[in-house]
């Protein structure tokens, strides 16, 4: 049965959809299997059972997943110049994750430039995926599905905006450039959810052709100030508004208090996905079934899109393979994305989430709001360099290290590192011993009041 296992692995989605339980993909609801599914077949062999499942999976579900846009690590892209005070582009690990000949050539000919985002770009890639699916919905509608036999020229033009060169408005290069200007972050440093949100806001507000002219971000919570939204729709009743919430929903894992709300977000018609993941990687979550989150993984390395023909590039940006992760295994630091198209949708959105434990609606921003400036200091946003990434054996930020402040480039005022969510019934307590530098600051969730 090893042969069947290999087939299932090649198909990529065999073991990721259970026979029972409704599947939700960015607001769309699917039965997992066809009516003609062979669920009555009895077998003790899991590989054969998985193969039977894939044959009977709902084709509408598969088409929807395949139509999601996502991005991965790339190599040999247009070089990004290293900042003299930033991390080095050259690391021994790249010889194993990239073509060693390419890595050696880059090291010899241009050692001060990044030709790949391996090890530091996964959060940017998942942020790009979130943004691309939001733009796809605006430009092509949620019902859009790709055709395996031909390229959709309108979507191809959309995806080209994300190609890896500074001349493309939504490229990785411009994500890096935008955040370097905002906070001083340097090429090769790992983006956190807040940095990703700030970059997205900066880039789309400077590129109205994308169709989303308005973006509200919250880098410390999921608070929505109603007066700010009202002004947007007063100016343009049909405006598209992208909401980005960089939140932290627990200490080292998502508090079970929020599970229901995460599922509600992904099943809502407003969701454009979640960028976050496991402690060792950032992933793009686009749906769920039962208590498992479905995701697309940006860590599969591909060559630069500029070296591909149109068809190859087009196919490389669609999620034909996905995986699942139980929500209890998910890192609590994440970026939530939601799209609202017009005043009527805003009213519906407000009603839909009025009882949320994550999203809060407030009348107006208080004058003394500590987070109004979005905390632009370099050390405040989970910066993670390629060098520290190799030491920590993962691309995603180590929450424990962040909370301790050991990776901070400069001392920060108390509590500014934390990306905690200020929910209606949660109390966050910061425990520390200032006299002992070895004692980590820890977020303790007191659920007794929930």
Swiss-Prot record:
One BP term from GO: protein processing
Reactions catalysed according to its record: [protein]-C-terminal L-amino acid-glycyl-phosphatidylethanolamide + H2O = [protein]-C-terminal L-amino acid-glycine + a 1,2-diacyl-sn-glycero-3-phosphoethanolamine
Annotated signal peptide: none
Example GO molecular function: protein-phosphatidylethanolamide deconjugating activity
UniProt keywords, alphabetically: Autophagy, Cytoplasm, Hydrolase, Nucleus, Protease, Protein transport, Thiol protease, Transport
Family: Belongs to the peptidase C54 family.
Record protein name field: Probable cysteine protease ATG4
